[in-house]
Each structure stands twice: as C-alpha cells, then as structure tokens.
Amino acid sequence: GKHSFKAVTKRYFELSKQPFTADIPEVKNGHISPYDPLFKKHAKNIGWDWQLLASISYQESHFNPTVVSWAGAEGLMGIMPNTAKALGVTPHELKDPDTGIRTGVDCLRRFRQGFSEITDPEEKVKFTLAAYNAGIGHIYDAQRLARKYGKDPNKWDNNVAEYIRLKNDPEYY
C-alpha cells in the first residue's frame, strides 16, 4: 500500500476517541496479525487497503475476536450488538473472525454510503472512519454545526473535526 501500517494506524488513532500511543504491534515478516488473510479478503469489498481494516481491528480489539468493550462492542472489529442485529448477525457470531471482519466492512460500507455528497476519496474515508467510531448521527450533527459556523461540512480536518469536539458544548448547539 501507499501508506505504512504505522502511518495508517496513527491516522485511525487520531480519529479515535482514545489517545494515540506507540503501542502498535510489530510487523513481523510482513504480517500484522493472524487475521491478515481475512483483512485482505474483506478489504476487496470496500476497496480499502487491508492494513486500514487491520488498524481498526487493532484499535477496537487488539486482535482479540472474543473481546467485549466497556461499551458492549464485540469481536475483532468492535461491532455494537444492535448494529450487528441490523446487519443480520448475532453478537455470538461476531466472535468468529471471518464474520466479525465481514460485518465490520458491511458497517463501514453503509456509513460510507451516508456521505455520498463527499466526493474526495480521502475525505470520504475520514468521515466513514469517524462515523464508525462515534456514530453517524454525531458526524451529521458536527457537519450541520460546521455549515452553521461557515466551515466546510465536507472537509474533516480543521472543519467538521472541530465540531465533534464542540458538540458537547451547549453554546454551539
């Protein structure tokens, strides 16, 4: 890919609620995780670098397919049970690595479709990842705020990203 795993992972962490740490798995012999073949297989369904899917999985689960987060997200891709149900998958099925990754990609594709007005491919990835992380409703709210305050609702950096942070401030609502 055109970006190294560390660079891609750092960018995903920057979009995440959690602070970026240097605690990134070491890439050994070109392998990031035992699930690399599954990331490669399912990345084709969204047209993304498989390392970006691996980055999401590392952030969501540290590559543990049976983990349940503090918020209740399950599996390698950190899918919420209601999201899984909406995609026809039970929370138990998310523990299967292939199903978990496929469901994560289905979820990402749905979020991406929600940003059809964003034409720049890199911007669309940023918005899609942000929606995956924070929920699409929060991103739509931040876009409305960006528009209201004269920023570009279709640009992430220094535009919509600022309003994600300010959304909790009633002065901006």
Residue ranges and their predicted role:
Residues G1-L15:
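Extended ligand-binding regions for polar small-molecule ligands
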Residues Y12, Q18-Y173:
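Catalytic glycan-binding domains that act on GlcNAc-containing polysaccharides
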